[in-house]
């Protein structure tokens, strides 16, 4: 994993999202669910992911965020988890199973340790988009389409109007994720927003190439970045 991250960084990734595996990742499609199962079977723990970040931070300077589930944070101990994030150099936390209404469970700790709690914005009402955007920190994760993560052949949501409402309410950058896999899609999303988030497409490369995958992930990241 460290090699893959370093290749992604060397080829122009602007931010790295690392998943801490959970047995029931409700926001994820089959590709990332499969990766969660494999990681847990291989003995990946929260502490091992923390150690990975400590190693990466020897030379990786771009922002890094964790994506995981509330249960993972609770079972580790929320304060211990979030304070460790700060110490090892994690900039933000993405918890897809915590809706806006429940973020107070984690927000005070995130603010205490200066770790951004990343807000999700899905296709929803203008009022709700504005409400979430006004309180967002770090960056806003715009969900391209309702459903789970995974690659999609086309994205039909009117994302431009969602981003317009976000921009009217905050200067926090927003990036679009869920279903982005091709350079063409990435360009389209980056034209609308501040960036594109890619997960499943990279996991597929890792599944296909195994030990040889860092090189291929690097090439893929470069192709995506060049398209922007």
Predicted regions and their residues:
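Active-site-adjacent beta->alpha loops and helix N-cap segments on the catalytic face
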Residues: 23-32, 41-54, 74-80, 95-112, ...
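Catalytic cores of alpha/beta
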Residues: 1-8, 124-134, 176, 180-196
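Histidine/lysine/aspartate-rich catalytic loop segments that bind and position anionic ligands
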Residues: 115-150
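Short beta-strand/loop segments at the ligand-binding rim of alpha/beta enzyme cores
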Residues: 59-69, 110-120, 167-177
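Glycine-rich phosphate-binding active-site loops on the catalytic face of alpha/beta enzymes
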Residues: 13-25, 90-94, 99, 144-150, ...
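Active-site beta->alpha loop and helix N-cap motifs at the rims of alpha/beta catalytic domains
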Residues: 4, 9, 14-16, 20-22, ...
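Active-site/ligand-binding-proximal alpha/beta "capping" segment
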Residues: 142-144, 149-195
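Conserved, mostly hydrophobic/aromatic
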Residues: 19, 85, 132, 189, ...
């Amino acid at each position: 994993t460290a090699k893959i991250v370093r290749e992604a960084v060397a080829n122009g990734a602007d931010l790295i999202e690392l998943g801490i595996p959970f047995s029931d990742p409700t926001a994820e499609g089959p590709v990332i669910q499969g990766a969660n199962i494999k990681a847990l079977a291989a003995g990946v723990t929260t502490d091992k992911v923390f150690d990975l970040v400590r190693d990466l931070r020897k030379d990786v300077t771009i922002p890094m965020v964790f994506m995981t589930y509330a249960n993972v944070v609770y079972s580790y101990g929320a304060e211990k988890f979030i304070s460790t994030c700060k110490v090892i150099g994690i900039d933000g936390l993405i918890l897809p199973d915590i809706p806006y209404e429940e973020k107070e469970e984690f927000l005070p700790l995130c603010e205490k340790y200066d770790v951004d709690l990343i807000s999700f914005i899905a296709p929803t009402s203008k009022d709700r988009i504005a409400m979430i955007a006004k309180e967002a920190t770090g960056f806003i994760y715009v969900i391209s389409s309702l459903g789970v993560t995974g690659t999609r052949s086309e994205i039909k949501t009117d994302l431009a109007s969602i981003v317009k409402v976000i921009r009217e309410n905050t200067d926090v950058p927003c990036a679009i994720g869920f279903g982005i896999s091709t350079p063409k899609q990435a360009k389209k999303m980056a034209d609308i927003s501040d960036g594109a988030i890619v997960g499943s497409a990279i996991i597929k490369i890792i599944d296909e190439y195994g030990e040889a995958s860092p090189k291929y992930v690097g090439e893929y990241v470069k192709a995506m970045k060049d398209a922007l």
